[in-house]
Amino acid sequence: MINHNLKLKIMKNLTLILITLILIVGCQNSPEIVKESWIEKPVSSWPDFALTNEISFTEKTYYDVANSFLVNTGFDTIGVSCKHIFMVFENQLGLNSIDLGSNFNYWKMYPKNHKEKAVTLKRFINKNPNEQIGQFNTLKVRDWIIFEIEGQNNQLYPLKIRYTPVETNEIVYAVGWGMMQKDNNKPALIKLQCFKNLGDYFYIKPLETDTHPAGKSGSPVIDKNGYLVGIVSGQEGNLGVIGGVKYLTTLFDKYDIEYNNSSH
C-alpha cells in the first residue's frame, strides 16, 4: 500500500508537470510580435507613411491641411484621416454632415514637400449624409474617415495594425507635421504615454515639453514595434486625445472591409 507521504509526493510531481505543460502550450499559442524592419533605424530612414492632404472643392482648395496615412488591412490598402476636419468644411464651406458634397473635386495624400508621391482617393467609404458633424467632444469617439485609393503607390508605406488595446502608461509615438514645426523635411516624432484608455479613444500625456499639438490632427500613432495603434484627434486640457483602433475595426465590420487581426 502506498503510504501517505508518497501519495503527496506523486501528487506534487503531477501538479508540477501539469503546470509546465500549460505554460509550454500557452507560449506556443502566443504569436510572436515581429518588429517592423525600419523601427530601430533613424527616423530620417523611415519609409514615407506620415502624409498630409490636398483637398479641392469648387470654392476652395486646401493645401497641406491636417495629416493622413495609409493602412494595410492584410488584404488591401486604405487611406485614413481625421473626421473632425469636417469642422473646417462646416465653418468655411457650409457643409453640415459627413459628406463632401456635390462641389467636391479631389482629395490627395502625400508626404509634405513631395507631391510627386501623391495618392488620389477614389471613394469616401464611411461618408454619411445623415451623420451630423457636431462638436469635438462628440467627434472624438468616431474620429476616423477612411477611403478607397486609386491604384497602388509603392513610394508610400501602409502601416500594419495592432489590434490589442494600448495599456495604461504604455509609450507610443505620434508621427506627423504640425503648424508650428520649423523643419518640414521630415515629420516630427512625438513621444507619448497613455494615461487612460476608454476603448474608442484614449488619453495621452506628451513626454516632451515643446510639442505644439496644433495641426497634428490625423497623424498616425504607432507603438514601439511600428504598428498603428491610433490617430491624433485633439486636446483636452493637458491631455491629448487619440482615436483608438477599436473604432477603426468597427468601420471595417460595418463596411465589409476584410482585415487580418490574427497577429496581435
Language-model segments: residues:
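Catalytic histidine site
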Residues: E36, E40-K108, S233-G237, V241
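Active-site region of chymotrypsin-like
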Residues: V43-A66, E150-Y157, Q181-H264
